[in-house]
């Protein structure tokens, strides 16, 4: 969804426009979970493009006909070229609790990644030490601890094959900057389209083939288990895998 929201924009036409293009996979009184498309930004940045957080806020304002400001809290982020699940808080209580849950790794996140090269082992755990370069907006992976590094752990499993690519399922154990992109590249399996981490060519739409597929956590207020899954992008590439 790419919109420039003008002051005073409102009405059912706008709500219907967004509703048809933004996939809400779960909503209750405290949280809303959206399937983000690649190219959307979760929170405002220097580009000035309308962030997903603002689109969700306007969507809720129209859906419930709220006269005042609508509260939306950003609990975590996905890189702009990544698609998949994003959790927003609709109340301050949910926001503070979810922030703590993400910080303490109480939220389980699973990603799917398309890579050109098959991993040497079909399943394994990657442990690296990542150093973030702010100027380059890039992380570098090391086998041993180095100054300013942070330990990064993920588990991967080969789950699908196509004529030209392999599909990996990735469970994050830590949440570091560009962690999956960096660690898979370090393993020799850069994500399709990810020029920054060594893939040869970009994707035509500027995306990378990384998708936040599944998320589960204990609801911050009701304490029920929330478990949701996002459909992969509707392209031949994503749909063309034979699952193992």
How would you name each of these model-derived features?
Residues 1-244:
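RNA pseudouridine synthases
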